[in-house]
Amino acid sequence: MYRLAAFDMDGTLLMRDHKIGSITLNALHQLADAGVTLTFATGRHYLDMKGILSHSGLNGYLITGNGTRVCDAEGNPLYGMDLPAELVEFVLRTPWQTNASIHLFRDDGWFTDRNDPDLLIAHTTSGFHFQLTEWDELPLTGNHKFCFIASHQELVELKAQLEQQMGGEADFCFSATDCLEVLPRGCNKGVALEKLSHHLDLTLADCMAFGDAMNDKEMLSRVGRGLVMGNALPQLKQELPQLQIIGRCEQQGVAHYLHHWLSSPHLTYSPEF
């Protein structure tokens, strides 16, 4: 039986109203009651996640910022990685050929120089919001990650620019089709979950994980059982063909899977099909 379950949030647990569905909440509480450690692994900020979980009655370990931070259930930091100061300065001062908005995440919040209220819709449950700033007002140290937000095609073109200019100094991933992230080199949910597992005297083989986007790839591929959402990005399904595909997020596919798994933990096939 797996001893830890790690869940992505957007596209995996969160419904279109950006809340966890009632059936899924029930399944997660049952999982915790069965002695499985809950872990929420997300690109969202720690402050955002605490707001979401406070409305759900759930508690668990947090992997936030796509692996840049790991905290215990009380919010105590266990692990963290930041972007190098010189890379932050380079990204902020380079005139990239793009219309994408740029967002920088630090322990004290989410910062941007562009006011786009539509971006706050996904954070209505938690009340988390961006802080408008001039880039030269922020320290170059203590920065977790960058996010660029635009159409997918524009971000594909921007990613090519970033990779050409920065080479192997950072990692890049699409956490959604319209969100390109720049992360510290070697930082991802899989590495963060490995650090957490070691802290808990577990191995990745003791873990199951659920996800839908490319920022879930390393986590899903390294755990004892990785489950891909039915609504996952096509690229994720293509790159992890060996993993089971379960139901869609809007159908609360995680709950459906967990209800079957809790009654038959040694099930070797996905009950979705």
Swiss-Prot record:
Q: Which domain of life is it from?
A: Bacteria
Which cofactor(s) are needed, names only? Answer: Mg(2+)
Q: InterPro entries this protein is in?
A: Cof, HAD-like_sf, HAD-SF_hydro_IIB, HAD_sf, HMP-PP_phosphatase
- Check the record and name the SUPFAM superfamilies matching this protein: HAD-like
Q: What class of enzyme is it?
A: hydrolase
Report the protein's function. Catalyzes the hydrolysis of 4-amino-2-methyl-5-hydroxymethylpyrimidine pyrophosphate (HMP-PP) to 4-amino-2-methyl-5-hydroxymethylpyrimidine phosphate (HMP-P).
- For this entry, the protein name equals HMP-PP phosphatase
Organism the protein comes from: Yersinia pestis
